[in-house]
């Protein structure tokens, strides 16, 4: 019997990699529902191949999608719109597995809906957990949802932890003999740039990651090290560990995806070629393993692996994220919202590369922190933070 999969963000890089794995295992998985924000022509081709029962697009894309469906004689797929549609498919009774791969805050409500419906949730949308934190984790416990990390680093940590670690007490302290988490970072494309060189970075340069094939937003986040900051926050929530037990290690080759240190002096690492199909396949099948077409690591090819500390003077975003996690409450929501606005402005060439962390820092300083008591107050603060960030960008000439 096949398991039914819903892919939120099917036309993105994670969505496409997920389809690649599902296509290799039609005896195990079927696609029930998909969503896309853009690339409607690509979405139609996906629908022709995988024949989902339901598709969700933004309201303004409905006419385009239905027109293309009519041209292709596709009449057996239901079309839904907007956030309501996303929540519907993420929590649908016929869905077993939800791939949460919508980028940014837009993925929060459908991801939370999947968790509250008790689904197996493959979490690729780190921003959803950065914003909702313990609300998301408590919902997973309350509804017996299985929240499995797809980010290569968190998936590596998950594989390197004791098998029952997620069931351990959530104290903020390392449990079951764990002493520290080592979160690896490639360092991005500008690892060896000077501060002066960083002021001249273009969006095109920032979107070219040296090791991974990713979307624009996450590529820019990787270049500023904000991606690693968001991943630090995600790790703290997923594994119930305080931020000072998480050390970021720059590892330019992206072969070791993260490590876990233990009290007996052991360090366990998960290694592999940098291909998102591996963590996706792991999360899909855990505790079993799926065959993929990712080649096994050739250790003779990588005779030297390098490690260094991150330069937080050149890349202040990492410390901003650590400070936001330490502050708790709504600070991570403010951080994430301001960063999304700043990255968007950078991609539109309204601000420079080094202005991205400045926008985030200004927004964090401008807004008062408070407890994250509900999803409603998180969404309210997200909206306010976006407005403050936009105003600041306008004030500096963006």
From Swiss-Prot:
Q: Which SUPFAM superfamilies match?
A: 1-deoxy-D-xylulose-5-phosphate reductoisomerase, C-terminal domain, Glyceraldehyde-3-phosphate dehydrogenase-like, C-terminal domain, NAD(P)-binding Rossmann-fold domains
One GO BP on record is: isopentenyl diphosphate biosynthetic process, methylerythritol 4-phosphate pathway involved in terpenoid biosynthetic process
Keywords attached to this Swiss-Prot or TrEMBL record, sorted alphabetically, are: Isoprene biosynthesis, Manganese, Metal-binding, NADP, Oxidoreductase
Q: Which residues bind 1-deoxy-D-xylulose 5-phosphate?
A: 126, 152-153, 186, 209, 222, 227-228, 231
Which top-level group of life is the source organism from?
A: Bacteria
Please explain the role this protein plays, according to its UniProt record: Catalyzes the NADPH-dependent rearrangement and reduction of 1-deoxy-D-xylulose-5-phosphate (DXP) to 2-C-methyl-D-erythritol 4-phosphate (MEP).
| Protein name in the entry | 1-deoxy-D-xylulose 5-phosphate reductoisomerase
Source organism of this protein record: Acinetobacter baumannii (strain ACICU)
Q: What is the lineage of its organism?
A: Bacteria, Pseudomonadati, Pseudomonadota, Gammaproteobacteria, Moraxellales
């Amino acid at each position: 019997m096949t398991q039914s999969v819903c892919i939120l963000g099917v036309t993105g890089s994670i969505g496409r990699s997920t389809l690649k794995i599902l296509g290799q295992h039609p005896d195990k998985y079927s696609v029930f529902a998909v969503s896309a924000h853009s690339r409607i022509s690509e979405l139609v081709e996906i629908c022709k191949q995988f024949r989902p029962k339901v598709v969700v697009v933004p309201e303004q894309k409905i006419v385009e999608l239905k027109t293309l469906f009519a041209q292709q004689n596709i009449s057996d797929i239901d079309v839904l719109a907007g956030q309501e549609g996303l929540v519907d498919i993420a929590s649908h009774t016929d869905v077993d597995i939800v791939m949460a791969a919508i980028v940014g805050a837009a993925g929060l409500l459908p991801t939370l809906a999947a968790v509250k419906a008790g689904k197996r949730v493959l979490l690729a949308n780190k921003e959803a957990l950065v914003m909702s934190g313990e609300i998301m984790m408590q919902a997973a416990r309350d509804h017996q949802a299985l929240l499995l990390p797809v980010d290569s680093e968190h998936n590596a940590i998950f594989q390197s932890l004791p098998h029952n670690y997620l069931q351990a007490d959530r104290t903020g302290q390392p449990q079951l003999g764990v002493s520290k988490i080592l979160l690896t970072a490639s360092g991005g494309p500008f690892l060896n740039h000077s501060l002066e060189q960083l002021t001249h970075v273009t969006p095109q340069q920032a979107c070219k990651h040296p090791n991974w094939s990713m979307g624009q937003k996450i590529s820019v986040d990787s270049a500023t090290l904000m991606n690693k900051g968001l991943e630090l926050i995600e790790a703290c929530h997923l594994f119930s560990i305080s931020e000072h037990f998480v050390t970021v290690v720059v590892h330019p080759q992206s072969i070791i995806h993260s490590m876990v240190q233990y009290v007996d002096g052991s360090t366990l690492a998960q290694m592999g070629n940098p291909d998102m199909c591996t963590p996706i396949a792991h999360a899909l099948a855990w505790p079993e393993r799926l065959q993929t077409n990712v080649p096994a690591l050739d250790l003779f090819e990588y005779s030297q692996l390098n490690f260094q500390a991150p330069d937080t003077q050149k890349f202040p975003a990492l410390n901003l994220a650590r400070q936001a996690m330490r502050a708790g409450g709504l600070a991570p929501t403010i951080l994430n919202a301001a960063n999304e606005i700043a990255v968007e402005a950078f991609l539109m060439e309204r601000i420079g590369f080094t202005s991205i962390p400045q926008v985030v820092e200004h927004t964090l300083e401008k807004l008062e922190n408070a407890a994250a008591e509900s999803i409603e107050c998180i969404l309210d603060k997200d909206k306010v933070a976006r407005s403050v960030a936009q105003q600041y960008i306008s004030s500096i000439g963006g």
